[in-house]
Amino acid sequence: MGRKWNNIKEKKASKDANTSRIYAKFGREIYVAAKQGEPDPELNQNLKFVLERAKTYNVPKAIIERAIEKAKGGSEENYDELRYEGFGPNGAMVIVDALTNNVNRTAADVRSTFGKNGGNMGVSGSVAYMFDPTAVIGFEGKTADETLELLMEADIDVRDILEEDDAVIVYAEPDQFHAVQEALQNAGITEFTVAELTMLAQNDVALPEDARAQFEKLIDALEDLEDVQQVYHNVDLGA
């Protein structure tokens, strides 16, 4: 799973480089989570998860509070959660998750972006079956063995625990996200380098240099779309 962590690192690095964009996306995601449930994260697991993710991207408190207050204020702005699947150069697989208040606009934007960058949209299910929904939690201050021991003591099973670049990365089932994080917090871990619910490719692929350059342009263009929240793919960008 080391290569999978490479992809997450590359993704975080690219997003960290464009803070205004990522803050805007988090503001929307926090608003939607708070509006769909309680505005209190202790009573709303979806909101709690989004806030934990936001911490790893250093989203300012003011943006978080503004989004929650907007939801509390009874804003009538509604968003649909959408998933698109498609292919990039050399048949590389791509999943795009979006939050939108205009489904037709978003579908057209995503389709156009695929087409302009050597890819094409697929039908629902054409790609997702090659990915596994996965909770990924990364932190420093423990070894993989110590992490395994404390999770076993908490009676939590996970898929894998790896040490990568001075950090420990835990891969778990999505419904174990909060249990894993709480067990780690109880063991003294307070800062997380990554806290994601992601779609991990079952098999990564390497692309030739020219195709890889075009693929990276496709991913960047998709992530630049206002309505797109997450982009997942099966290309090893850490090679």
Swiss-Prot record:
InterPro entries linked: Integrase-like_N (IPR017856), TACO1_YebC-like_2nd/3rd_dom (IPR048300), TACO1_YebC_N (IPR049083), Transcrip_reg_TACO1-like (IPR002876), Transcrip_reg_TACO1-like_dom3 (IPR026564), Transcrip_reg_TACO1_YeeN (IPR026562), YebC-like (IPR029072)
The keyword Transcription regulation belongs to this UniProt entry's keyword annotation: yes
Alphabetized UniProt keyword annotations: Cytoplasm, DNA-binding, Transcription, Transcription regulation
Subcellular location: Cytoplasm
An annotated GO BP: regulation of DNA-templated transcription
Domain of life: Bacteria
A GO term, aspect molecular function: DNA binding
An annotated GO cellular component: cytosol
Pfam families referenced in this protein's UniProt entry, alphabetically: TACO1_YebC_N, Transcrip_reg
Annotated family: Belongs to the TACO1 family. YeeN subfamily.
Matches recorded under PANTHER family: TRANSLATIONAL ACTIVATOR OF CYTOCHROME C OXIDASE 1 (PTHR12532:SF0)
Name of the molecule in the record: Probable transcriptional regulatory protein BLi00754/BL02339
Species: Bacillus licheniformis (strain ATCC 14580 / DSM 13 / JCM 2505 / CCUG 7422 / NBRC 12200 / NCIMB 9375 / NCTC 10341 / NRRL NRS-1264 / Gibson 46)
